[in-house]
Protein backbone atom coordinates (compact mmCIF):
# COMPACT_ATOMS: atom_id res chain seq x y z
CA UNK A 1 0.00 0.00 0.00
CA UNK A 2 1.36 3.48 -0.85
CA UNK A 3 2.40 5.62 2.11
CA UNK A 4 0.71 8.91 2.93
CA UNK A 5 3.83 10.57 1.51
CA UNK A 6 3.32 9.10 -1.97
CA UNK A 7 -0.42 8.40 -2.13
CA UNK A 8 -2.27 10.92 -4.31
CA UNK A 9 -4.57 13.23 -2.29
CA UNK A 10 -6.96 13.38 -5.26
CA UNK A 11 -8.81 10.81 -7.34
CA UNK A 12 -8.09 10.48 -11.07
CA UNK A 13 -11.48 12.09 -11.83
CA UNK A 14 -10.66 15.08 -9.63
CA UNK A 15 -7.31 15.56 -11.32
CA UNK A 16 -8.96 15.24 -14.74
CA UNK A 17 -11.50 17.92 -13.80
CA UNK A 18 -8.73 20.27 -12.73
CA UNK A 19 -6.78 19.69 -15.92
CA UNK A 20 -9.92 20.25 -18.02
CA UNK A 21 -11.42 23.24 -16.21
CA UNK A 22 -8.35 24.79 -14.59
CA UNK A 23 -9.79 24.71 -11.08
CA UNK A 24 -10.97 22.30 -8.41
CA UNK A 25 -12.98 23.06 -5.26
CA UNK A 26 -12.15 21.22 -2.04
CA UNK A 27 -14.50 21.43 0.91
CA UNK A 28 -13.43 21.81 4.55
CA UNK A 29 -9.69 22.18 4.05
CA UNK A 30 -9.48 24.29 7.22
CA UNK A 31 -11.38 24.10 10.50
CA UNK A 32 -12.99 27.06 12.26
CA UNK A 33 -10.19 27.01 14.85
CA UNK A 34 -7.52 27.12 12.14
CA UNK A 35 -9.27 30.01 10.40
CA UNK A 36 -9.40 31.98 13.66
CA UNK A 37 -5.71 31.30 14.29
CA UNK A 38 -4.86 32.71 10.85
CA UNK A 39 -7.09 35.78 11.00
CA UNK A 40 -5.87 36.88 14.43
CA UNK A 41 -2.33 37.21 13.01
CA UNK A 42 -3.33 39.67 10.26
CA UNK A 43 -3.86 42.87 12.25
CA UNK A 44 -0.47 42.67 14.03
CA UNK A 45 1.26 42.17 10.68
CA UNK A 46 -0.44 45.18 9.07
CA UNK A 47 0.53 47.17 12.18
CA UNK A 48 4.18 46.19 11.42
CA UNK A 49 4.41 43.85 14.42
CA UNK A 50 6.54 41.12 12.87
CA UNK A 51 7.22 38.17 15.17
CA UNK A 52 10.49 37.28 13.43
CA UNK A 53 11.58 40.88 12.90
CA UNK A 54 11.60 40.33 9.13
CA UNK A 55 9.41 42.44 6.84
CA UNK A 56 7.15 40.83 4.21
CA UNK A 57 7.97 40.89 0.52
CA UNK A 58 5.08 43.19 -0.33
CA UNK A 59 2.03 44.74 1.26
CA UNK A 60 -0.82 47.13 0.47
CA UNK A 61 -3.44 48.73 2.67
CA UNK A 62 -1.63 50.14 5.70
CA UNK A 63 -3.61 51.54 8.66
CA UNK A 64 -3.40 55.32 8.77
CA UNK A 65 -1.85 55.52 5.30
CA UNK A 66 -4.38 53.92 2.95
CA UNK A 67 -8.05 54.61 2.30
CA UNK A 68 -10.37 52.82 4.72
CA UNK A 69 -11.88 50.73 1.93
CA UNK A 70 -8.54 49.74 0.38
CA UNK A 71 -7.97 46.05 -0.22
CA UNK A 72 -5.27 44.84 2.13
CA UNK A 73 -2.76 42.41 0.67
CA UNK A 74 0.45 40.99 2.10
CA UNK A 75 2.94 38.66 0.44
CA UNK A 76 5.72 36.65 2.08
CA UNK A 77 4.04 36.37 5.47
CA UNK A 78 5.90 33.20 6.39
CA UNK A 79 9.06 35.25 6.75
CA UNK A 80 7.32 37.46 9.37
CA UNK A 81 5.17 35.10 11.41
CA UNK A 82 5.70 31.45 12.34
CA UNK A 83 2.03 30.75 12.99
CA UNK A 84 1.20 31.69 9.42
CA UNK A 85 4.32 29.86 8.24
CA UNK A 86 2.68 26.65 9.46
CA UNK A 87 0.14 27.09 6.68
CA UNK A 88 2.27 28.82 4.04
CA UNK A 89 4.91 26.07 4.27
CA UNK A 90 2.52 23.17 4.75
CA UNK A 91 3.66 19.98 3.07
CA UNK A 92 0.03 18.86 2.82
CA UNK A 93 -0.98 21.83 0.70
CA UNK A 94 2.17 21.59 -1.41
CA UNK A 95 1.45 17.88 -1.96
CA UNK A 96 -2.08 18.69 -3.14
CA UNK A 97 -0.85 21.44 -5.41
CA UNK A 98 1.86 19.25 -6.91
CA UNK A 99 -0.52 16.31 -7.41
CA UNK A 100 -2.93 18.38 -9.48
CA UNK A 101 -0.08 19.61 -11.67
CA UNK A 102 1.52 16.18 -12.04
CA UNK A 103 4.76 17.25 -10.35
CA UNK A 104 6.90 14.95 -8.17
CA UNK A 105 7.62 17.79 -5.76
CA UNK A 106 6.67 21.33 -4.85
CA UNK A 107 8.46 24.30 -3.31
CA UNK A 108 7.13 27.49 -1.78
CA UNK A 109 6.18 30.09 -4.36
CA UNK A 110 4.02 32.80 -2.77
CA UNK A 111 1.75 33.22 0.25
CA UNK A 112 -0.72 36.09 0.04
CA UNK A 113 -3.58 37.26 2.21
CA UNK A 114 -6.42 39.22 0.62
CA UNK A 115 -8.66 41.31 2.87
CA UNK A 116 -11.49 43.21 1.16
CA UNK A 117 -13.44 45.46 3.58
CA UNK A 118 -16.90 46.81 2.71
CA UNK A 119 -16.80 48.83 -0.53
CA UNK A 120 -13.31 47.58 -1.38
CA UNK A 121 -12.65 48.06 -5.12
CA UNK A 122 -12.15 45.47 -7.81
CA UNK A 123 -9.04 43.40 -8.49
CA UNK A 124 -8.08 43.27 -12.17
CA UNK A 125 -8.41 39.98 -14.06
CA UNK A 126 -5.03 38.34 -14.52
CA UNK A 127 -3.15 35.03 -14.74
CA UNK A 128 -0.77 34.11 -11.92
CA UNK A 129 1.86 32.62 -14.22
CA UNK A 130 2.38 36.07 -15.74
CA UNK A 131 4.04 37.15 -12.50
CA UNK A 132 6.57 34.29 -12.30
CA UNK A 133 8.23 34.45 -15.72
CA UNK A 134 11.61 34.98 -14.02
CA UNK A 135 11.29 31.32 -12.97
CA UNK A 136 12.04 28.30 -15.19
CA UNK A 137 9.55 26.78 -15.79
CA UNK A 138 7.20 29.77 -15.23
CA UNK A 139 4.45 27.66 -13.73
CA UNK A 140 2.71 27.68 -10.38
CA UNK A 141 -0.55 26.53 -8.86
CA UNK A 142 -2.48 28.31 -6.14
CA UNK A 143 -4.59 26.97 -3.30
CA UNK A 144 -7.01 29.88 -2.60
CA UNK A 145 -8.69 29.39 0.78
CA UNK A 146 -11.82 31.22 1.93
CA UNK A 147 -11.42 32.59 5.47
CA UNK A 148 -14.88 34.18 5.47
CA UNK A 149 -18.10 33.76 3.51
CA UNK A 150 -17.00 34.58 -0.02
CA UNK A 151 -20.04 35.59 -2.07
CA UNK A 152 -20.81 37.75 -5.07
CA UNK A 153 -21.87 40.54 -2.70
CA UNK A 154 -18.54 40.51 -0.84
CA UNK A 155 -16.43 40.52 -4.02
CA UNK A 156 -15.58 36.85 -4.19
CA UNK A 157 -13.04 35.33 -6.55
CA UNK A 158 -14.28 35.18 -10.14
CA UNK A 159 -12.81 32.67 -12.57
CA UNK A 160 -13.19 31.73 -16.23
CA UNK A 161 -13.34 27.92 -16.44
CA UNK A 162 -11.14 26.47 -19.15
CA UNK A 163 -9.31 29.74 -19.82
CA UNK A 164 -5.97 28.14 -18.91
CA UNK A 165 -6.13 26.51 -22.35
CA UNK A 166 -6.38 29.81 -24.22
CA UNK A 167 -3.68 30.83 -26.66
CA UNK A 168 -3.34 34.45 -25.56
CA UNK A 169 -0.93 36.94 -24.03
CA UNK A 170 -0.91 38.78 -20.72
CA UNK A 171 1.29 41.41 -19.10
CA UNK A 172 2.30 42.41 -15.59
CA UNK A 173 0.00 45.15 -14.32
CA UNK A 174 -1.02 46.74 -11.02
CA UNK A 175 -4.02 44.76 -9.81
CA UNK A 176 -5.60 47.03 -7.20
CA UNK A 177 -8.49 49.48 -7.84
CA UNK A 178 -8.25 49.66 -11.64
CA UNK A 179 -9.45 52.86 -13.33
CA UNK A 180 -10.86 50.90 -16.25
CA UNK A 181 -13.25 47.94 -16.16
CA UNK A 182 -11.50 45.25 -14.10
CA UNK A 183 -12.44 42.71 -16.78
CA UNK A 184 -10.72 44.58 -19.63
CA UNK A 185 -7.61 42.32 -19.70
CA UNK A 186 -9.95 39.31 -19.81
CA UNK A 187 -11.92 40.69 -22.77
CA UNK A 188 -8.67 41.42 -24.60
CA UNK A 189 -7.36 37.90 -23.96
CA UNK A 190 -10.68 36.33 -24.99
CA UNK A 191 -10.64 38.24 -28.28
CA UNK A 192 -7.06 37.14 -28.92
CA UNK A 193 -8.01 33.54 -28.15
CA UNK A 194 -11.11 33.67 -30.37
CA UNK A 195 -13.52 33.27 -27.44
CA UNK A 196 -16.60 35.36 -28.14
CA UNK A 197 -18.44 34.98 -24.83
CA UNK A 198 -16.21 33.78 -21.97
CA UNK A 199 -18.08 32.57 -18.90
CA UNK A 200 -17.23 34.42 -15.68
CA UNK A 201 -18.02 32.23 -12.67
CA UNK A 202 -18.25 33.91 -9.23
CA UNK A 203 -17.27 31.29 -6.64
CA UNK A 204 -19.50 30.99 -3.57
CA UNK A 205 -17.24 29.56 -0.87
CA UNK A 206 -17.93 29.19 2.86
CA UNK A 207 -15.06 29.60 5.33
CA UNK A 208 -12.59 26.72 5.14
CA UNK A 209 -13.32 25.71 1.56
CA UNK A 210 -10.55 26.05 -1.01
CA UNK A 211 -10.24 26.33 -4.76
CA UNK A 212 -7.10 25.20 -6.57
CA UNK A 213 -6.23 27.46 -9.51
CA UNK A 214 -4.07 26.63 -12.51
CA UNK A 215 -1.46 29.34 -13.04
CA UNK A 216 -2.86 30.21 -16.48
CA UNK A 217 -6.49 30.46 -15.36
CA UNK A 218 -7.95 33.95 -15.74
CA UNK A 219 -9.40 35.31 -12.50
CA UNK A 220 -10.14 38.55 -10.66
CA UNK A 221 -12.73 39.94 -8.25
CA UNK A 222 -15.51 42.51 -8.24
CA UNK A 223 -16.14 45.24 -5.69
CA UNK A 224 -17.27 44.27 -2.19
CA UNK A 225 -20.77 45.76 -2.20
CA UNK A 226 -21.57 44.59 1.32
CA UNK A 227 -21.96 47.32 3.93
CA UNK A 228 -20.83 45.17 6.85
CA UNK A 229 -18.89 42.08 5.69
CA UNK A 230 -15.16 41.86 5.11
CA UNK A 231 -13.98 39.20 2.66
CA UNK A 232 -10.81 37.37 3.71
CA UNK A 233 -8.80 34.73 1.90
CA UNK A 234 -5.37 33.10 1.91
CA UNK A 235 -3.64 32.17 -1.35
CA UNK A 236 -0.80 29.63 -1.14
CA UNK A 237 1.13 29.10 -4.38
CA UNK A 238 3.55 26.29 -5.17
CA UNK A 239 6.34 26.08 -7.75
CA UNK A 240 7.71 22.76 -9.03
CA UNK A 241 10.50 21.50 -6.80
CA UNK A 242 12.95 21.41 -9.72
CA UNK A 243 12.36 25.07 -10.66
CA UNK A 244 15.33 27.34 -11.30
CA UNK A 245 15.77 30.98 -12.22
CA UNK A 246 15.72 32.17 -15.81
CA UNK A 247 18.91 33.98 -16.83
CA UNK A 248 19.11 37.44 -15.28
CA UNK A 249 17.06 39.92 -17.30
CA UNK A 250 14.64 37.28 -18.56
CA UNK A 251 11.02 37.48 -17.50
CA UNK A 252 9.22 39.30 -14.68
CA UNK A 253 9.24 38.67 -10.96
CA UNK A 254 10.70 41.46 -8.86
CA UNK A 255 10.03 39.60 -5.61
CA UNK A 256 11.76 36.46 -6.85
CA UNK A 257 14.70 38.33 -8.34
CA UNK A 258 15.76 39.86 -5.03
CA UNK A 259 16.58 36.33 -3.82
CA UNK A 260 18.93 35.38 -6.66
CA UNK A 261 22.35 33.93 -5.85
CA UNK A 262 25.30 35.47 -7.63
CA UNK A 263 26.56 33.34 -10.51
CA UNK A 264 23.88 30.64 -10.13
CA UNK A 265 20.41 29.91 -11.47
CA UNK A 266 19.62 27.63 -8.53
CA UNK A 267 16.83 28.76 -6.22
CA UNK A 268 18.05 28.94 -2.62
CA UNK A 269 15.96 26.75 -0.32
CA UNK A 270 16.52 29.24 2.51
CA UNK A 271 14.09 31.55 0.72
CA UNK A 272 12.05 29.13 -1.42
CA UNK A 273 12.07 25.86 0.52
CA UNK A 274 10.96 22.52 -0.90
CA UNK A 275 7.77 21.68 0.98
CA UNK A 276 6.93 18.24 -0.38
CA UNK A 277 8.69 15.75 -2.58
CA UNK A 278 7.72 12.25 -3.71
CA UNK A 279 10.87 10.74 -2.21
CA UNK A 280 10.11 12.24 1.22
CA UNK A 281 12.59 15.12 1.04
CA UNK A 282 11.61 18.41 2.70
CA UNK A 283 13.97 21.35 3.24
CA UNK A 284 15.62 20.52 6.60
CA UNK A 285 15.34 23.89 8.38
CA UNK A 286 11.53 23.75 8.24
CA UNK A 287 11.43 21.21 11.07
CA UNK A 288 12.90 23.82 13.42
CA UNK A 289 11.24 26.89 11.94
CA UNK A 290 7.55 25.99 12.24
CA UNK A 291 5.11 23.13 12.60
CA UNK A 292 3.09 21.96 9.61
CA UNK A 293 -0.42 23.15 10.51
CA UNK A 294 -2.01 20.57 8.20
CA UNK A 295 0.33 17.64 8.78
CA UNK A 296 -1.35 14.24 8.54
CA UNK A 297 -0.51 11.93 11.43
CA UNK A 298 0.31 8.38 10.40
CA UNK A 299 2.06 6.64 7.56
Question: Each predicted region: which residue ranges?
Answer:
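Non-heme Fe(II)-dependent double-stranded beta-helix
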Residues: 1-20, 27-125, 131-134
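Phosphate/oxyanion-binding loops and surfaces in catalytic or ligand/nucleic-acid-binding neighborhoods
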Residues: 45-48, 103, 150, 166, ...
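Non-heme Fe(II)/2-oxoglutarate
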Residues: 48, 56, 65, 210-212, ...
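Short, structured patches in soluble enzyme cores that scaffold and shape functional sites
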Residues: 112, 127-129, 145-149, 161
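Short, surface-exposed loop/helix-turn segments at secondary-structure junctions
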Residues: 126-128, 185-197, 228-231, 249-257
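A short beta-loop-beta micro-motif enriched in histidine and acidic residues
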Residues: 128-140, 198-199, 205, 229-230
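Short, conserved beta-strand element in jelly-roll/cupin
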Residues: 134-152, 204-205, 212, 236-241
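Double-stranded beta-helix
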Residues: 150-218
Amino acid sequence: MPSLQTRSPFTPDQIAQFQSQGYFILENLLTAAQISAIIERFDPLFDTQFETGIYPDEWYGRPGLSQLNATRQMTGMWRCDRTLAGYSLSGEIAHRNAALMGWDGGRYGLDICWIKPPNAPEVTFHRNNTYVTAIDPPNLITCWIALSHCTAATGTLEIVPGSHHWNCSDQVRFLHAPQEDYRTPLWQAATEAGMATPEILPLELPPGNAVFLHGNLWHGSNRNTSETQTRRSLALSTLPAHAKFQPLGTGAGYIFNRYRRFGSLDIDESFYPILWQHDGYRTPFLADYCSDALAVIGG
